[in-house]
Amino acid sequence: MKAHTLFLIILVYVGALSGLQAQHGKQQRADVLFTNFSFVKAADIYKELIEAQYNEKYAHRRLADCYLMLRDPEKAVKHYRQVIDQQKVANEVYYNYAVALRYLGDYEGSEKWAKHYKKQGGDAKLVRALKKDQSTYLPNEPIFRLKESNFNTPNSDFGAFKHGDLVYFVSSKERDGVSQKTYSWNEQPFLDMFTINLATNDSIPTAVAGEINSRYHEGPMTISRDGKTMYFSRNNYYHKTKTKDKEGVNHLQIYKAEYLNGQWTNIQDLPFNNDNYSVSHPALSPDGKTLYFASDMPGGFGKSDLYSVSIHDNGSYGEVENLGPIINTEGEELFPFVNAEGNLFFSSDGHPGHGLLDVFGTLKNDKGVLVEVTNLKSPINSNRDDFSFFMAEDGLSGYIASNRKDKIGNDDIYEFETILPLLLKGIVTDSINGNPIANAKLVLTKQDGTPIADLTTDVNGYYQHSIQREQYYNLAASHPKYQDRLTLFNSMDIPSKQTELVVNIKLVPVLDLKVLADLNTIYFDFDRYNIRPDAAKELHKIIDLLTNQYPNMTIKVESHTDSRGSKSYNDRLSIDRANSTYEYLISNGLTKERVIAHDGYGEHRLTNGCSDGVHCEEPDHQLNRRTDFTVIKME
């Protein structure tokens, strides 16, 4: 029977953990969608997590962020209110809440929470911008980690595009064994396209095989998912003929190539190219049915706009369409890219940003309609040119290019990793028997004591909370039956793809049997030593505790009397009470070695002032007619 019961307990426990893992998988998927700017899809999953009552505070906050990004302040405010009044809230939430309230016209409320954000150490510049209606919502924390690529050359490098194990990129480095013309703009060789094979860990670039590279500029490029088709930019140089407009300018054009027998060949001119303006920077939609590009063709909004054109099944093209004023400005919009979720990214010097060209993402509502663009912030953007954004299909890594190092005329390629939210989780257990501890209280703070969250373990001893990376933390655990414990840990240098940090905690039981067994005091009737029914109930708690939870614990029995009667009589009576207690424990399952002593102390250890000669009521005397238990050993 016991084995069967234990099996059921284990089954329920494992099932509960499996359910939690499944919910965490959902949360991770939602977080990836969020960092990929797929806010509608992410919102749907966060709503599911809320319905499942999984990590609700976090899910409400993220759902509110999604709605704010989607410019739905009513729904954003609704979900911010689910977390805003809690004791420990990330400071960024106050700012986002202030932004949402301002969108609704609640200027008084917006100012209140903006001041609260500033008071908690928030950026005063953001508060000032909010008051001037110049704020644009941005993700709360940096969502990318950046490092310089190991295949940069001393020349200009940009336009990285990964397909399979190959990274294609554009560079003004010289091609081995090829005599190249020099571009008078910067006195470097004309741009060509190169590849790096990530599978071989070889950082030496190789020129793209085939007919792509010419005497003039090539790149950047985009490749279809099946790897058979490339669209790339090149100077207007086709069939070895260089064409200029009437002003003598040789513009950029987009060409199509096929991959055959390990070579890029069959170069084709596209029908919407024009000798009088540039068409460049191609980007394909995930399904390969739409081509995006940049052009300075007449009729646009600025110096260079972004356009799209449909690609038909027969290989023909539809009408070229301008992407409109939400994306295009009076400045330059360049280097479009569409990620696996269908979200458009691009570079612009016309939208508010950090410097010259900045990288922006686009936001769509639940109907798929473009509603806004948002700056990707630092570290993607700097005070210099930042462009040619590329994101891998998994949404967790990619490349950009930048001249942020102030190398005149030179651009470098940077690799980025998406920083997914980190989930702190663990199980609090008994250090003696390994059993999970339910209702343990956990206080999570930063190293400097800044409060983050108050947590409570569930029936399986499990806890979780989302935390920031690159931080040091304190985690204080407490429970009435256990000694307090402070655990120090950190989230430094954790790989970007790792989304969980496990901190398990073992608590040492207190050496107090009354506390451990939830024991009520065992009392005796006046001048009696028999075990009363209420006392028997308490003794069975002790038997259960020592049998099922602490099989190596040993205890001592200590019995007492009130002060009525002679001291010698009471000494004898207390011994009888100790003996009856001991015999009850042994006769009901405890072995003799578990109770190492059972002693009587007569009236020598009264719990109150009811000694000889002091008038006390019966309830007061009752408090002294008792048996206590002392833990001698716990292993």
Task: Cite the ranges covered by each PLM segment.
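N-terminal targeting segments with Sec-dependent signals, encompassing both cleavable signal peptides
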Residues: 3-9, 19-635
